[in-house]
Amino acid sequence: GLGDVYKRQIAVSAYSYMALVPVIQPPIMRLLTTKHERLIRMKPPRVVSHTEKVMFPIIGLLLTCFLVPSGLPLLGMLFFGNLLKESGVTRRLAETARGPLIDTITILLGLTVGASTQASEFLTIDSILIFALGALSFIIATASGVIFVKIFNLVLGKDNKINPLIGNAGVSAVPDSARISQVIGLEYDPTNYLLMHAMGPNVAGVIGSAVAAGILLGFLM
């Protein structure tokens, strides 16, 4: 398995990529799209019923338990938090989870990762290679998302085109990737709001990456 040193290096690299989303993604998005594509206006998202909102985390949690149990620590928390919010009967718990609790956990996680990473361990060739590999995967994921939308548009009707600027949101940096879609879209059309469209692939990216990681861990363990 991965040693503690590599785990710390990977954790620091992951946080670095999250912070670098506004730097890495916009040039790739502009490079791979035309001005016409950036101006595509999408239909408003459909209204989701309360029943669907409640059933989604329940079904997702059950499928994770059966199919990818090793991904449960991450996806379980995602679905549990979603259920707290959407159920409508645990408002105080939902407010605590998305406010004081997540702030406390974020501080403790940052302190733990930072305190356990010494310069002598982190500033090594292995660390640089890990960071470079992660950055490359980040770039490939961003480009792949944009290109996939462009390919998908080839088979869609004129009125159902998807703005390729939301393709970058498939990278599971929530909600930063979706915000970048919104910011770049507003640069070319101040009335074209892509945020809610981009949140779909953004959350799907979280679920997909966690499932993929769970499957990989299943093979390694």
Mark where each language-model region is.
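Short helical (or helix-break) motifs at transmembrane helix termini and adjacent helical loops
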Residues: 23-27, 171-187
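Short, small-residue-biased leader/transition segments that mark boundaries at the very start
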Residues: 2-6
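Transmembrane alpha-helices that form the ion-translocation and gating core
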Residues: 1, 107, 111, 116-119, ...
